[in-house]
Amino acid sequence: MEVVNTIGEFKREHDMPVNNGSREREVLTHISKQLPEDLEDFGRVLYRSIFDISKAYEAMYKEKDSPLYKAISNLINADPAPFPKRAIVACQGREGAYSQIAAEKLFEVPEIMFNNTFEGVIRMVTDGLCEYGILPIENSTAGSVNEIYDLLVRYNVHIVRSTRVRVDHQLLAAKGTRFQDIKTIYSHPQAINQCSHFLSALKDVEIIPFDNTAMAAQKVAKDPTRTSASISSKSCIDLYNMEVLAQDIQNFDSNHTRFICIAKDARIFPGSNRTSIMMVMSHKPGTLFSVLSKFNATGANLVKLESRPIPGRDFEFMFYFDIELSIYDKKFASLISELDHCGEQFKYFGTYLEII
């Protein structure tokens, strides 16, 4: 590492970038010529790993001058105010929505404002109507909520907290409704997916996606025909004076949804150790491996890797990463700012604490 440090100092003194792709290709070509054919691939992988470890070490010092490094360092070193107990919070849906349950778990005294759509929640935050917004990002049964990932790329908001909420779905209907009379069931697509085993056993029942589980309950509660039902939370039973036709109909007993708390401005509250980022990398062999090597070199724990298609670019993808690394680790800010230079596009969503 002394040699790496010497190279790093030379680059800093001469204002040279940490990454030097042409020089790396020269070295790899030279190594390939020195090795037997059956060892060429292994040799290139070995030297790429050496390059990645070396660049991660160099970046600890070189990246201190980058705007992103300074911005993250300022957030870390800012006055460590605790996460607020009271706030005006935007949630999607109506009273009884799972987003409301998440908000009440994150804030002791939330003043909740509802919006019909996820995008509407984000706009309430960016327009300054609410200080924070609550959005579901993934479920342990149905997977990621892809719409949220797409919205995070489009809007300039920041994740400042997250939590997990146990989700127990109930089949609800207006008072006096009989199970055998049900012809239509409404709910959010994620809830429908999470209850697919129960729903697949029903005959002659139409399943209709709805914007929100609580909004579905509100609609069904007003149905004069008594032929519809909703998949909703237990909170909706009393809120909308509903009948429980079937309890806990989710596919698995352990069914949890992760919710993120977003804010207009980036904040890093004390105890934060989970970071979310997005990258678009060049469509070349080894680029994803190179990024993963940087996580390994800095001791960052990769807890989530998600890919999403890039609109207008056939079979090319953007990648979402969640990593765990203490904000007080001196490698943290340099890792994030180094990743900023590793792809075609990079976005830092935030560093936060997850409440279990």
Where are the predicted features?
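Domain-level signature for soluble enzymes in the chorismate/prephenate branch of the shikimate pathway
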Residues: M1-I356
